[in-house]
């Protein structure tokens, strides 16, 4: 559904992130796409639409803070999702993604 994809890409463009993340000492880096926010219904739309990834619910120790929902997808599945959203992402995000992929090819 293109309108759903465009909506999710817009939310991701504003609130999400992607890049190469360290897995720990001597283990190298992996690609990750993720988004974290207080609106759980929006986060669950990512899981429902893309049918991959995982959601972590973080309950803060401080009662004044809100519960947050974190959706994350690693490796090739993360790249696949960003590629699907790419036409709807800002030019800056598109350039960043292509730059990351160029770095992986080296």
Model feature map: region roles:
Residues 1-106:
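Internal intein/HINT superfamily modules and their associated LAGLIDADG
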């Amino acid at each position: 559904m293109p309108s759903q994809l465009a909506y999710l890409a817009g939310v991701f463009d504003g609130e999400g992130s992607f890049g190469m993340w360290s897995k720990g000492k001597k283990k190298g880096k992996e690609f990750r796409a993720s988004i974290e926010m207080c609106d759980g219904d929006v986060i669950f739309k990512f899981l429902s639409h893309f049918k991959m990834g995982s959601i972590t619910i973080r309950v803060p120790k401080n009662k004044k803070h809100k519960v947050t929902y974190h959706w994350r997808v690693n490796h090739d599945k993360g790249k696949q999702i960003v590629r699907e959203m790419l036409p709807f992402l800002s030019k800056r995000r598109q350039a960043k993604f292509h730059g990351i992929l160029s770095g992986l090819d080296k």
